[in-house]
Amino acid sequence: MVMAYFVENFWGEKNSGFDVLYHNMKHGQISTKELADFVRERATIEEAYSRSMTKLAKSASNYSQLGTFAPVWDVFKTSTEKLANCHLDLVRKLQELIKEVQKYGEEQVKSHKKTKEEVAGTLEAVQTIQSTTQALQKSKENYNAKCVEQERLKKEGATQREIEKAAVKSKKATDTYKLYVEKYALAKADFEQKMTETAQKFQDIEETHLIHIKEVIGSLSNAIKEIHLQIGQVHEEFINNMANTTVESLIQKFAESKGTGKERPGLIEFEECDTASAVEGIKPRKRKTFALPGIIKKEKDAESVECPDADSLNIPDVDEEGYSIKPETNQNDTKENHFYSSSDSDSEDEEPKKYRIEIKPMHPNNSHHTMASLDELRVSIGNITLSPAISRHSPVQMNRNLSNEELTKSKPSAPPNERGTSDLLAWDPLFGPSLDSSSSSSLTSSSSARPTTPLSVGTIVPPPRPASRPKLTSGKLSGINEIPRPFSPPVTSNTSPPPAAPLARAESSSSISSSASLSAANTPTVGVSRGPSPVSLGNQDTLPVAVALTESVNAYFKGADPTKCIVKITGDMTMSFPSGIIKVFTSNPTPAVLCFRVKNISRLEQILPNAQLVFSDPSQCDSNTKDFWMNMQAVTVYLKKLSEQNPAASYYNVDVLKYQVSSNGIQSTPLNLATYWKCSASTTDLRVDYKYNPEAMVAPSVLSNIQVVVPVDGGVMNMQSLPPAIWNAEQMKAFWKLSSISEKSENGGSGSLRAKFDLSEGPSKPTTLAVQFLSEGSTLSGVDFELVGTGYRLSLIKKRFATGRYLADC
């Protein structure tokens, strides 16, 4: 029991103790708010650190996998990921603590309002005694003055009338003084009683407040302590793993994985030449003038073993590149009897009259040549499209017998390694289907002519699939993360990239070319495209622009408790300009201002426009829309800079704005998750429940390309799963792949992934699983876009959302 400090120490001459205690109670609300801000700042720091650690773990997985040191990176990666998860877990606990403090603050405000009403009587008593004290002091001073005046008149021998008059005033002052003394006594008694009760009430409130605040601080310190214990365990595990990763084990693993065989070269004995089997008239071999030393073509005639004198040789003529020139012989006889090929390596000289020398085309199995030909075919086909108003047509026929050599003459191909780098986000239906499989087969096999019109430089056509992002293989799903792009103008390399979509997330500029008919037939787009849009007409034409709305949903599920789900949804808007528009902007000193409106923003918490290029009016009062306009001078300068960096690009992308969507916990996740682990020394049972949540989307859409990855330790020897999964023993991860989930799926999009693992070094430790999916044609926020004013038209709008970090713990 705390002593009554407030009752004993807040009286005083001026009776101001009540005012001090009341304001002290109000200061408790300020301290509660400041404590919440402090915890929130700590959570922000921990979240930033967790993101940095996750990025570091991802970079560790991208380091060189060559050499004996390569397995050590897996140890670093695992340890760093666990550290990141520790700090992420602390973030979750701190966010829960913040909610608790905020709830307490709301209750505190209500309690203080109630207390204010209860102590209103004490406030009146304080005011009464203060006013009575002042009146008493004045009456006392008046009484003393009248008494002194009466005595002075008596001593000075004043008239009787003056003395009587002074006596009346003195008596009146005496009565007033006595009256206020009595009033003060009553006010004092009432004040002391009420002030004692109120002071004790204020002390009780402060005790309760401080106890609760100390509990919050205790929860904070315990959370930090637990995380530090986990971090210590992670470091201890890292030390043990490094101790177990011996030099011998690293060398042994490298030898087993990269070894070239255990068989040593055998003995070869000298064999005498069998001269009896030699044939007369054998032709000698002679090295050509352009031959490379050490490279000798095998003999086609096994009997050529003797070398007669050089005088008996017939040396054929060679051209400037070193190839043998075909002699003038009977062509018919040659076709009937002989057909040989010669490479650019060393070869023997044979009699010209018996051979026909030809250079065959490159073997079709050459993968690099094939990829390059397909790339150039894509570029060639991408520049052939149907014009909306066909005036002149030129028939183009693509024959079956076009050789790879003929196709490669059209345009230099992109590097083949860039052709395979397509991830889930790169399957962009807005920009046309992939030409890797369909174009090379269906288009090249067409024998009918198609009326086409070649595109000008500034023509807008639906672009091909983006090839700017690497494929997220199942082995790298554990590092799923989307890092927002800064608004600063991106740096474009000087080398010409392969044709890519104008709205690809990883590029600021790209070249767009594909078949408009294919895109219209196979691509579900949002909005209406007017097809190719030439921008070389004049300044009075409406100029085409394309827009992409891309959102990323990040979620963290903890067991089956929906209240512990953490969700963050962000989005960005990218605008794409055709290259021909730069000439229109530069030729016109005052181009039309591009104004646009973002609609359905009621679910957005924050909108961050690109401050360098975009303006907005902060005084707009409409809660569901917001208007913006672009700084056309800055846009022109920026587009010219992009054009100088990459003059071959057909389109240039501009980051317009970014935004954050308000979330309501698990109700805002399109795919709900819950994980259950049952771990024993010999087996581990895993179940992942998932449920399609249409309420998270404004318009329910299909989730496609779902991938689930679960790390499982404990020395997995065998895995049984339903539906079938893939076990990667090297990475110790199980992978599930589902094509799509929607309301029309079985059980309304609900289901389970089950697996049983047989262990040799159990038990396993429950880990965090990661999920990836995407959805085309809609957004989670329902945000929409429209142009305002004249001078521009919206040729294409694309909407999509995909996962960022989508994790689940047990």
Swiss-Prot record:
Residues 521-810 are annotated as: Mediates interaction with DAB2, EPS15, EPS15R and ITSN1. The modification Phosphoserine is found at residues 312, 387, 394, 403, 488, 493, 496, 508, 510-511, 533. Keywords: Coated pit, Coiled coil, Disulfide bond, Endocytosis, Isopeptide bond, Membrane, Phosphoprotein, Ubl conjugation. GO terms for biological process: clathrin coat assembly; clathrin-dependent endocytosis; membrane invagination; protein localization to plasma membrane; synaptic vesicle endocytosis. InterPro entries: AH/BAR_dom_sf (IPR027267), F_BAR (IPR031160), FCH_dom (IPR001060), FCHo2_F-BAR (IPR030122), GMIP/FCHO2-like_FCH (IPR054713), MHD (IPR028565), Muniscin_C (IPR018808). Residues 87-156 form a coiled coil. Belongs to the FCHO family. Functions in an early step of clathrin-mediated endocytosis. Has both a membrane binding/bending activity and the ability to recruit proteins essential to the formation of functional clathrin-coated pits. Has a lipid-binding activity with a preference for membranes enriched in phosphatidylserine and phosphoinositides (Pi(4,5) biphosphate) like the plasma membrane. Its membrane-bending activity might be important for the subsequent action of clathrin and adaptors in the formation of clathrin-coated vesicles. This is F-BAR domain only protein 2. The lineage of its organism: Eukaryota, Metazoa, Chordata, Craniata, Vertebrata. The gene is FCHO2.
